[in-house]
Amino acid sequence: MLALLVLVTVALASAHHGGEHFEGEKVFRVNVEDENHINIIRELASTTQIDFWKPDSVTQIKPHSTVDFRVKAEDTVTVENVLKQNELQYKVLISNLRNVVEAQFDSRVRATGHSYEKYNKWETIEAWTQQVATENPALISRSVIGTTFEGRAIYLLKVGKAGQNKPAIFMDCGFHAREWISPAFCQWFVREAVRTYGREIQVTELLDKLDFYVLPVLNIDGYIYTWTKSRFWRKTRSTHTGSSCIGTDPNRNFDAGWCEIGASRNPCDETYCGPAAESEKETKALADFIRNKLSSIKAYLTIHSYSQMMIYPYSYAYKLGENNAELNALAKATVKELASLHGTKYTYGPGATTIYPAAGGSDDWAYDQGIRYSFTFELRDTGRYGFLLPESQIRATCEETFLAIKYVASYVLEHLY
């Protein structure tokens, strides 16, 4: 029986990732102290196949920081030799990626249909958006705000008790395709909001007085690609004139210091900003919706992974928002609330200094539109599993994040503008 379960798990992992096997691949964490170290990493990236996990690209590495990256099996010896020869301190976060890829799925035989404690394929999430709206007509309605590059409908769930001219909070998940815990949280949020409405005073008040616009997966094409072809795909799946490389980083594609810093103009790079701001159908759909609802949207929350961080503007420049002190105090209180459940520690602060400079992000864009409360959440973990957070951690991750979102929402409700 045990052998059968192992075979089922291996078969699932293989089926989910289009034949990628990951055997012998490693994930390194390197301590970077100065520009010389950065140059060594840059040279490595130019001669070997390196997939940067944190930060997103070699251009975002800063002195006195760490960098996490994935290395193909055939390059691991070369990479370790270079790091040792140049006396860079490092550790191996994942010694055999295949084992961790397979372990992200619960070893139990997977039930068909939707589950809030498993990672769901897009077709399952799509069906869920219809089902959850149909089953809860007094609290949820579903709409389509646009289509993806490959022609798929982008669904938005409006969660809240019916009412006229209610203030709203916009929350999206699934910007970067490989960050699977992000869409899992948006689904959990909707379920918990409905389940606890009428039972929990705080949630009931929030849904009575606020609307939540929840976008479960923005980058649907990319998300599907991570299930069928390439588990660590990040970008959209758009094509580009004059290049065979695919995709744009949707979180470098907004008109907020577009492509000025921490983004690339090379279509082959993971942080490609696109040929123009809002060039991607997905980002344009999101931006158009927010512009149309700008008078009612009081907070913007975007859910990513990994790092355990809560960041706020600005990321496209080393400057602070006009209500920076308020954002800092709110972030401090929110991460304290989050930690109260499972002890998970988050760091917080302005994006550029807390994580890295990055232009064209949706949080900065929303803030510059006049949405005073704009936050990015980087969910679990801090690198042990990275983008491969096991399904066994979905519940705890979502429980603590739900606390955080409730805290922010209650604050916003008390500080309407």
Curated annotation (Swiss-Prot):
Enzyme class: hydrolase
The EC number(s) this enzyme carries: 3.4.17.2
Domain Peptidase M14 residue range list: 118-412
Binding site for substrate: 176-179, 234, 251-252, 305-306, 356
Example GO BP: proteolysis
Metal-binding keyword on record: yes
Propeptide: 16-110
Subcellular location: Secreted; Zymogen granule lumen
Signal sequence interval, chain numbering: 1-15
Main location: secreted
GO cellular component assignments: cytoplasmic vesicle; extracellular space
Binding site for Zn(2+): 176, 179, 304
Keyword Oxidoreductase: no
InterPro entries: CPB_M14_CPD, M14A-like_propep, M14A_act_pep, Peptidase_M14
GO molecular function, one term: zinc ion binding
Family membership noted in the UniProt record: Belongs to the peptidase M14 family.
Name under which the protein is recorded: Carboxypeptidase B
Organism: Homo sapiens (Human)
Upper classification of the organism: Eukaryota, Metazoa, Chordata, Craniata, Vertebrata
Name of the gene this protein is made from: CPB1
